[in-house]
Protein backbone atom coordinates (compact mmCIF):
# COMPACT_ATOMS: atom_id res chain seq x y z
CA UNK A 1 0.00 0.00 0.00
CA UNK A 2 1.44 3.41 -0.95
CA UNK A 3 2.82 5.43 1.93
CA UNK A 4 0.53 8.41 1.31
CA UNK A 5 -2.51 6.10 1.57
CA UNK A 6 -1.28 4.73 4.91
CA UNK A 7 -0.68 8.29 6.12
CA UNK A 8 -4.18 9.32 5.08
CA UNK A 9 -5.76 6.33 6.82
CA UNK A 10 -3.87 7.01 10.03
CA UNK A 11 -4.57 10.75 10.03
CA UNK A 12 -7.91 10.55 11.93
CA UNK A 13 -6.35 8.38 14.66
CA UNK A 14 -3.39 10.71 15.02
CA UNK A 15 -5.66 13.73 15.18
CA UNK A 16 -7.82 12.06 17.82
CA UNK A 17 -4.74 11.25 19.89
CA UNK A 18 -3.50 14.84 19.67
CA UNK A 19 -6.90 16.15 20.71
CA UNK A 20 -7.00 13.70 23.62
CA UNK A 21 -3.57 14.80 24.79
CA UNK A 22 -4.54 18.45 24.48
CA UNK A 23 -7.66 17.83 26.55
CA UNK A 24 -5.72 15.91 29.19
CA UNK A 25 -3.06 18.60 29.49
CA UNK A 26 -5.74 21.29 29.78
CA UNK A 27 -7.31 19.39 32.66
CA UNK A 28 -3.89 18.78 34.22
CA UNK A 29 -3.02 22.49 34.25
CA UNK A 30 -6.46 23.38 35.56
CA UNK A 31 -5.89 20.91 38.40
CA UNK A 32 -2.41 22.39 38.86
CA UNK A 33 -3.88 25.84 39.47
CA UNK A 34 -6.33 24.46 42.02
CA UNK A 35 -3.54 22.54 43.75
CA UNK A 36 -1.36 25.66 43.73
CA UNK A 37 -4.08 27.62 45.52
CA UNK A 38 -4.56 24.91 48.16
CA UNK A 39 -0.85 24.37 48.82
CA UNK A 40 -0.23 28.13 48.89
CA UNK A 41 -2.82 28.43 51.64
CA UNK A 42 -1.16 25.58 53.55
CA UNK A 43 2.31 27.11 53.18
CA UNK A 44 1.14 30.59 54.22
CA UNK A 45 -0.62 29.12 57.24
CA UNK A 46 2.67 27.51 58.29
CA UNK A 47 4.42 30.88 57.91
CA UNK A 48 1.82 32.70 59.99
CA UNK A 49 1.90 30.04 62.70
CA UNK A 50 5.72 30.10 62.83
CA UNK A 51 6.66 33.68 61.85
CA UNK A 52 10.25 33.41 63.09
CA UNK A 53 11.04 30.87 60.39
CA UNK A 54 10.06 33.27 57.63
CA UNK A 55 9.18 32.42 54.04
CA UNK A 56 12.38 30.61 53.14
CA UNK A 57 14.03 27.37 54.06
CA UNK A 58 17.15 27.40 56.21
CA UNK A 59 20.19 25.96 54.48
CA UNK A 60 21.82 23.20 56.52
CA UNK A 61 25.59 23.76 56.61
CA UNK A 62 26.61 20.28 57.73
CA UNK A 63 24.99 16.85 57.43
CA UNK A 64 23.64 15.04 60.50
CA UNK A 65 25.80 12.32 62.02
CA UNK A 66 23.44 9.54 60.91
CA UNK A 67 24.38 10.17 57.27
CA UNK A 68 27.96 9.24 58.17
CA UNK A 69 27.11 6.03 60.04
CA UNK A 70 29.86 3.57 58.98
CA UNK A 71 27.64 0.53 59.63
CA UNK A 72 25.52 1.51 56.63
CA UNK A 73 28.37 1.25 54.15
CA UNK A 74 30.96 3.22 52.22
CA UNK A 75 30.09 6.44 50.37
CA UNK A 76 31.15 6.31 46.72
CA UNK A 77 30.55 8.05 43.39
CA UNK A 78 30.02 6.37 40.03
CA UNK A 79 30.43 8.15 36.71
CA UNK A 80 27.90 6.59 34.36
CA UNK A 81 29.52 5.11 31.28
CA UNK A 82 28.71 2.22 28.98
CA UNK A 83 31.23 -0.09 27.42
CA UNK A 84 29.39 -0.93 24.21
CA UNK A 85 29.71 1.73 21.49
CA UNK A 86 28.08 3.52 19.75
CA UNK A 87 25.67 3.94 22.70
CA UNK A 88 26.47 7.10 24.63
CA UNK A 89 26.37 7.37 28.40
CA UNK A 90 25.07 10.36 30.29
CA UNK A 91 28.40 11.05 31.97
CA UNK A 92 26.52 11.92 35.15
CA UNK A 93 28.07 11.23 38.52
CA UNK A 94 25.82 9.38 40.98
CA UNK A 95 26.40 9.06 44.71
CA UNK A 96 25.78 5.69 46.33
CA UNK A 97 26.37 3.85 49.59
CA UNK A 98 27.79 0.34 49.29
CA UNK A 99 28.30 -2.53 51.72
CA UNK A 100 28.94 -6.27 51.52
CA UNK A 101 30.97 -6.19 48.32
CA UNK A 102 31.90 -9.76 47.41
CA UNK A 103 29.27 -11.29 49.68
CA UNK A 104 26.82 -12.22 46.94
CA UNK A 105 24.65 -10.85 44.12
CA UNK A 106 24.06 -7.14 43.63
CA UNK A 107 21.02 -5.79 45.49
CA UNK A 108 20.30 -2.31 44.11
CA UNK A 109 17.97 0.06 45.98
CA UNK A 110 15.96 2.86 44.31
CA UNK A 111 14.38 5.45 46.62
CA UNK A 112 11.24 7.54 46.23
CA UNK A 113 10.28 11.20 46.72
CA UNK A 114 11.05 13.11 48.90
CA UNK A 115 13.79 10.72 50.03
CA UNK A 116 17.36 9.62 49.32
CA UNK A 117 19.65 6.63 49.88
CA UNK A 118 19.13 6.90 53.66
CA UNK A 119 15.60 5.50 53.26
CA UNK A 120 17.25 2.07 52.93
CA UNK A 121 19.30 2.21 56.16
CA UNK A 122 17.54 -0.81 57.68
CA UNK A 123 17.88 -2.90 54.53
CA UNK A 124 21.56 -1.98 54.07
CA UNK A 125 22.32 -3.39 57.52
CA UNK A 126 20.07 -6.43 57.10
CA UNK A 127 21.25 -7.78 53.75
CA UNK A 128 24.94 -6.84 53.52
CA UNK A 129 25.97 -10.22 54.96
CA UNK A 130 24.66 -12.11 51.90
CA UNK A 131 24.48 -9.48 49.13
CA UNK A 132 26.41 -6.56 47.74
CA UNK A 133 23.94 -3.87 48.78
CA UNK A 134 23.99 -0.53 46.96
CA UNK A 135 21.63 2.36 47.70
CA UNK A 136 21.91 5.08 45.08
CA UNK A 137 20.93 8.73 45.13
CA UNK A 138 19.12 8.95 41.82
CA UNK A 139 19.69 11.61 39.19
CA UNK A 140 18.63 15.03 40.51
CA UNK A 141 19.07 14.11 44.18
CA UNK A 142 22.11 15.77 45.76
CA UNK A 143 24.94 14.87 46.07
CA UNK A 144 24.37 13.06 42.74
CA UNK A 145 24.49 15.30 39.68
CA UNK A 146 21.29 17.27 39.14
CA UNK A 147 20.73 18.73 35.65
CA UNK A 148 18.31 21.67 35.74
CA UNK A 149 16.50 21.04 32.45
CA UNK A 150 13.19 19.17 32.58
CA UNK A 151 14.20 17.21 29.46
CA UNK A 152 16.99 15.59 31.47
CA UNK A 153 14.42 13.62 33.50
CA UNK A 154 12.60 11.63 30.84
CA UNK A 155 11.83 7.99 31.59
CA UNK A 156 14.30 6.80 28.95
CA UNK A 157 17.17 8.69 30.59
CA UNK A 158 16.24 7.54 34.08
CA UNK A 159 16.13 3.91 32.91
CA UNK A 160 19.52 4.35 31.25
CA UNK A 161 20.88 5.52 34.61
CA UNK A 162 19.78 2.27 36.24
CA UNK A 163 21.27 0.19 33.43
CA UNK A 164 24.56 2.09 33.49
CA UNK A 165 24.73 1.77 37.29
CA UNK A 166 24.38 -2.02 37.18
CA UNK A 167 26.98 -2.35 34.43
CA UNK A 168 29.24 0.30 35.98
CA UNK A 169 29.34 -1.65 39.24
CA UNK A 170 30.57 -4.67 37.29
CA UNK A 171 27.40 -6.78 37.25
CA UNK A 172 25.24 -8.25 34.51
CA UNK A 173 22.07 -8.45 36.62
CA UNK A 174 20.71 -7.47 40.02
CA UNK A 175 17.97 -7.83 42.58
CA UNK A 176 16.12 -4.53 42.24
CA UNK A 177 14.49 -3.18 45.42
CA UNK A 178 12.38 -0.05 45.11
CA UNK A 179 9.83 2.27 46.68
CA UNK A 180 7.52 5.02 45.40
CA UNK A 181 9.16 6.80 42.42
CA UNK A 182 11.93 4.23 42.45
CA UNK A 183 9.25 1.56 42.08
CA UNK A 184 7.69 3.28 39.06
CA UNK A 185 11.10 3.23 37.39
CA UNK A 186 11.81 -0.35 38.47
CA UNK A 187 8.60 -1.63 36.82
CA UNK A 188 9.55 0.07 33.55
CA UNK A 189 13.13 -1.15 33.81
CA UNK A 190 11.99 -4.76 34.22
CA UNK A 191 10.00 -4.44 30.98
CA UNK A 192 12.73 -2.89 28.83
CA UNK A 193 15.80 -4.57 30.40
CA UNK A 194 14.51 -7.93 31.69
CA UNK A 195 17.89 -9.64 31.42
CA UNK A 196 19.36 -7.20 33.97
CA UNK A 197 16.77 -7.95 36.67
CA UNK A 198 16.86 -11.33 38.40
CA UNK A 199 14.21 -10.50 41.02
CA UNK A 200 12.26 -7.42 42.07
CA UNK A 201 11.05 -6.25 45.46
CA UNK A 202 8.58 -3.37 45.28
CA UNK A 203 7.15 -1.39 48.19
CA UNK A 204 4.20 0.93 47.58
CA UNK A 205 4.67 1.98 43.99
CA UNK A 206 2.62 1.08 40.88
CA UNK A 207 3.67 0.90 37.22
CA UNK A 208 2.95 4.18 35.45
CA UNK A 209 0.56 2.62 32.95
CA UNK A 210 -1.37 0.85 35.72
CA UNK A 211 -1.92 3.94 37.86
CA UNK A 212 -2.92 5.88 34.74
CA UNK A 213 -5.54 3.27 33.85
CA UNK A 214 -6.64 2.87 37.47
CA UNK A 215 -7.02 6.62 38.09
CA UNK A 216 -9.36 7.01 35.13
CA UNK A 217 -11.83 4.70 36.88
CA UNK A 218 -11.11 5.68 40.51
CA UNK A 219 -11.34 9.42 41.08
CA UNK A 220 -10.24 8.97 44.69
CA UNK A 221 -6.76 8.07 43.46
CA UNK A 222 -6.61 11.34 41.52
CA UNK A 223 -7.26 13.27 44.73
CA UNK A 224 -4.55 11.30 46.52
CA UNK A 225 -2.14 12.29 43.75
CA UNK A 226 -2.98 16.00 44.02
CA UNK A 227 0.65 17.01 44.61
CA UNK A 228 1.55 15.70 41.15
CA UNK A 229 -0.56 18.43 39.58
CA UNK A 230 1.12 21.15 41.64
CA UNK A 231 4.50 19.88 40.46
CA UNK A 232 3.62 20.58 36.81
CA UNK A 233 4.12 24.30 37.46
CA UNK A 234 7.51 26.04 37.25
CA UNK A 235 9.33 27.36 40.39
CA UNK A 236 6.22 27.63 42.60
CA UNK A 237 6.41 24.05 44.00
CA UNK A 238 10.03 24.60 45.06
CA UNK A 239 9.04 27.83 46.81
CA UNK A 240 6.05 26.34 48.62
CA UNK A 241 7.95 23.26 49.81
CA UNK A 242 10.74 25.40 51.26
CA UNK A 243 8.54 27.91 53.11
CA UNK A 244 8.61 27.95 56.92
CA UNK A 245 11.83 25.91 56.84
CA UNK A 246 10.42 23.06 54.71
CA UNK A 247 7.38 22.53 56.92
CA UNK A 248 5.38 20.75 54.20
CA UNK A 249 8.21 18.23 53.80
CA UNK A 250 8.52 17.90 57.57
CA UNK A 251 4.81 17.14 57.82
CA UNK A 252 5.14 14.54 55.07
CA UNK A 253 7.68 12.62 57.14
CA UNK A 254 6.35 13.21 60.66
CA UNK A 255 2.56 13.38 60.28
CA UNK A 256 0.94 11.57 63.20
CA UNK A 257 -1.22 9.41 60.93
CA UNK A 258 0.65 9.25 57.60
CA UNK A 259 4.28 9.82 58.53
CA UNK A 260 7.15 7.53 59.52
CA UNK A 261 6.65 6.25 63.08
CA UNK A 262 9.59 6.83 65.39
CA UNK A 263 11.55 9.02 62.97
CA UNK A 264 14.15 10.85 65.06
CA UNK A 265 15.05 14.55 64.58
CA UNK A 266 18.45 13.49 63.25
CA UNK A 267 16.86 11.12 60.72
CA UNK A 268 14.48 13.87 59.60
CA UNK A 269 17.49 16.11 59.02
CA UNK A 270 19.05 13.34 56.91
CA UNK A 271 16.32 14.02 54.34
CA UNK A 272 16.15 17.80 54.75
CA UNK A 273 19.91 18.39 54.57
CA UNK A 274 20.29 17.92 50.82
CA UNK A 275 16.92 19.49 49.95
CA UNK A 276 17.98 22.61 51.86
CA UNK A 277 20.92 23.25 49.55
CA UNK A 278 20.31 25.93 46.87
CA UNK A 279 18.35 24.59 43.89
CA UNK A 280 18.23 21.00 45.18
CA UNK A 281 14.44 20.64 45.05
CA UNK A 282 14.23 21.23 41.30
CA UNK A 283 15.74 17.92 40.15
CA UNK A 284 13.38 15.70 42.18
CA UNK A 285 10.34 17.75 41.14
CA UNK A 286 11.40 17.52 37.48
CA UNK A 287 10.56 13.79 37.63
CA UNK A 288 6.91 14.80 38.00
CA UNK A 289 7.13 17.45 35.27
CA UNK A 290 7.63 14.63 32.77
CA UNK A 291 4.83 12.37 34.02
CA UNK A 292 2.15 13.44 31.54
CA UNK A 293 4.37 13.71 28.47
CA UNK A 294 3.64 10.19 27.24
CA UNK A 295 -0.10 10.04 27.93
CA UNK A 296 -1.74 7.68 27.19
CA UNK A 297 0.56 4.82 28.16
CA UNK A 298 -0.05 1.32 26.88
CA UNK A 299 -0.13 -1.33 29.64
CA UNK A 300 2.42 -4.11 29.20
CA UNK A 301 2.67 -7.61 30.60
CA UNK A 302 4.93 -7.96 33.63
CA UNK A 303 6.98 -11.14 33.94
CA UNK A 304 9.92 -10.53 36.29
CA UNK A 305 9.53 -12.55 39.53
CA UNK A 306 8.37 -9.87 41.95
CA UNK A 307 7.60 -9.47 45.64
CA UNK A 308 5.08 -6.64 46.09
CA UNK A 309 4.54 -5.17 49.56
CA UNK A 310 1.75 -2.65 50.11
CA UNK A 311 0.78 -0.58 53.12
CA UNK A 312 -2.83 -1.04 54.17
CA UNK A 313 -3.06 2.66 55.11
CA UNK A 314 -0.99 4.18 52.30
CA UNK A 315 -2.04 7.83 51.94
CA UNK A 316 -0.65 8.17 48.41
CA UNK A 317 -1.85 4.99 46.66
CA UNK A 318 -5.13 3.14 47.04
CA UNK A 319 -5.09 -0.53 48.02
CA UNK A 320 -7.01 -1.45 44.87
CA UNK A 321 -3.83 -0.88 42.87
CA UNK A 322 -2.47 -4.20 44.15
CA UNK A 323 -5.19 -6.12 42.34
CA UNK A 324 -4.78 -3.90 39.28
CA UNK A 325 -1.05 -4.68 39.17
CA UNK A 326 -1.76 -8.40 39.48
CA UNK A 327 -3.96 -8.35 36.38
CA UNK A 328 -0.96 -7.31 34.29
CA UNK A 329 1.32 -10.09 35.51
CA UNK A 330 2.21 -13.37 33.89
CA UNK A 331 0.60 -15.99 36.18
CA UNK A 332 2.84 -17.23 38.97
CA UNK A 333 5.36 -14.39 38.79
CA UNK A 334 3.88 -12.04 41.43
CA UNK A 335 3.81 -12.54 45.19
CA UNK A 336 1.90 -9.72 46.87
CA UNK A 337 1.20 -8.91 50.51
CA UNK A 338 -0.77 -6.11 52.15
CA UNK A 339 0.79 -5.21 55.50
CA UNK A 340 -1.88 -4.47 58.12
CA UNK A 341 -1.45 -1.18 59.93
CA UNK A 342 1.36 0.02 57.69
CA UNK A 343 1.31 3.10 55.50
CA UNK A 344 3.36 4.46 52.62
CA UNK A 345 6.82 4.12 54.19
CA UNK A 346 7.19 0.34 54.61
CA UNK A 347 11.03 0.17 54.28
CA UNK A 348 11.33 2.58 57.21
CA UNK A 349 8.16 1.97 59.23
CA UNK A 350 7.97 -1.84 59.04
CA UNK A 351 11.48 -3.07 58.20
CA UNK A 352 11.21 -6.34 60.15
CA UNK A 353 8.12 -7.47 58.23
CA UNK A 354 9.71 -6.40 54.95
CA UNK A 355 12.90 -8.32 55.73
CA UNK A 356 11.01 -11.51 56.59
CA UNK A 357 9.19 -11.46 53.26
CA UNK A 358 12.40 -10.64 51.38
CA UNK A 359 14.47 -13.43 52.94
CA UNK A 360 11.77 -15.97 52.09
CA UNK A 361 11.42 -14.61 48.54
CA UNK A 362 15.18 -14.68 47.91
CA UNK A 363 15.97 -17.93 49.74
CA UNK A 364 16.72 -19.94 46.60
CA UNK A 365 19.35 -17.40 45.50
CA UNK A 366 21.45 -17.80 48.63
CA UNK A 367 22.90 -21.14 47.59
Swiss-Prot record:
Main subcellular location of this protein, as a coarse class: membrane
A single BP term in Gene Ontology: lipid metabolic process
Keyword terms of this UniProt record: Endoplasmic reticulum, Hydrolase, Lipid metabolism, Membrane, Microsome, Transmembrane, Transmembrane helix
Domain of life of the native organism: Eukaryota
Active-site residues annotated for this sequence: 180 (nucleophile), 288 (proton donor), 344 (proton acceptor)
GO function term, MF aspect, one: epoxide hydrolase activity
A Pfam family hit: Abhydrolase_6
Annotated EC: 3.3.2.10
InterPro entries given in the database record: AB_hydrolase_1, AB_hydrolase_fold, Epox_hydrolase-like
Record-level GO cellular component terms: endoplasmic reticulum; membrane
Localization: Microsome membrane
Membrane-crossing residue ranges in chain numbering: 22-42
Membrane topology qualifier: Single-pass membrane protein
Regulation: Inhibited by 1-(1-acetylpiperidin-4-yl)-3-(4-(trifl uoromethoxy)phenyl)urea (TPAU), 1-cyclohexyl-3-dodecylurea (CDU), 12-(3-adamantan-1-yl-ureido)-dodecanoic acid (AUDA), 1-((3S, 5S, 7S)-adamantan-1-yl)-3-(5-(2-(2-ethoxyethoxy) ethoxy)pentyl)urea (AEPU) and to a lesser extent by 8-(3-((3S, 5S, 7S)-adamantan-1-yl)ureido) octanoic acid (AUOA).
Expression tissues: Predominantly expressed in skin, esophagus, lung and tongue and to a lesser extent in pancreas and eye.
Gene null: resulting phenotype: No visible phenotype. Mice are born at the expected Mendelian rate. No defect in the metabolism of epoxygenated fatty acid epoxide.
UniProt catalytic activity: an epoxide + H2O = an ethanediol; 9,10-epoxyoctadecanoate + H2O = 9,10-dihydroxyoctadecanoate; 9,10-epoxy-(12Z)-octadecenoate + H2O = 9,10-dihydroxy-(12Z)-octadecenoate; 8,9-epoxy-(5Z,11Z,14Z)-eicosatrienoate + H2O = 8,9-dihydroxy-(5Z,11Z,14Z)-eicosatrienoate
Family named by the database record: Belongs to the AB hydrolase superfamily. Epoxide hydrolase family.
Role played: Catalyzes the hydrolysis of epoxide-containing fatty acids. Active in vitro against epoxyeicosatrienoic acids (EETs) including 8,9-EET, 9,10-EET, 11,12-EET and 14,15-EET and leukotoxin.
Full protein name: Epoxide hydrolase 3
Source organism (scientific name): Mus musculus (Mouse)
Lineage of the organism: Eukaryota, Metazoa, Chordata, Craniata, Vertebrata
Protein's gene: Ephx3
